[in-house]
């Protein structure tokens, strides 16, 4: 049994102020992108926005380096991190709900998940969107299926989580890997 199976399940709804915080961060990010034109550096713009006083958290994330920027915490005690993935990470959090808010994609992306009927699902990633992953739900962001992947492919998102996910991140089952291959048409990455 995976270690995360012994953790208490944390499945919450985000509070209105958490959702509003995300909407405001994304709105300011969109304004910065529109104003910068071709000179736009999305990671630096996001770093500058998250450093603003109006977006300060109870515990501010470490915004140094290339990311991920972790260790932020909001007034509800939930973790806030900015994550930058240049590759697919298919995994699950057995005991933790996660909320992911895509900020930008270099290229195009889809979110892999499994619906209530156990069928694999690919959902287009839209900047400013919201992906909710219930405890135990396998998930991954990946380059859009059938579209050539640019060399600089990357997805950036802000995650709001109930705990440090290092203690609750697990590989998916062989069955999930087979479902991934069914819709993506390539082998699933080995995972975490």
Segments from the language model and where they lie:
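Conserved short histidine dyad/triad with adjacent acidic residue
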Residues: 80-97
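Short glycine/proline-enriched turns and hinge-like loops at secondary-structure junctions
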Residues: 94-96, 116, 145
């Amino acid at each position: 049994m995976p270690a995360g199976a012994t953790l208490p399940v944390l499945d919450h709804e985000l509070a209105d102020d958490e959702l509003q915080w995300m909407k405001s961060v994304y709105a300011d990010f969109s304004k910065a992108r529109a104003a910068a034109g071709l000179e736009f550096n999305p990671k630096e713009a996001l770093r500058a926005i998250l450093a603003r006083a109006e977006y300060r958290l109870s515990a501010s994330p470490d915004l140094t380096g290339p990311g991920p920027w972790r260790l932020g915490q909001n007034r509800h005690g939930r973790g806030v991190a900015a994550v930058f993935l240049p590759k697919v990470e298919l995994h699950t959090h057995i005991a933790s709900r996660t909320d992911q808010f895509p900020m930008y994609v270099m290229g195009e992306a889809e979110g892999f998940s499994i619906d209530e009927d156990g069928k694999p699902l690919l959902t287009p990633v839209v900047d400013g969107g919201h992906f909710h992953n219930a405890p135990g739900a396998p998930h991954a962001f990946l380059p859009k299926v059938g579209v050539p992947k640019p060399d600089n492919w990357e997805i950036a998102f802000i995650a709001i989580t109930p705990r440090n996910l290092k203690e609750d991140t697990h590989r998916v089952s062989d069955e999930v890997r087979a479902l991934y291959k069914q819709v993506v048409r390539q082998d699933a990455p080995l995972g975490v």
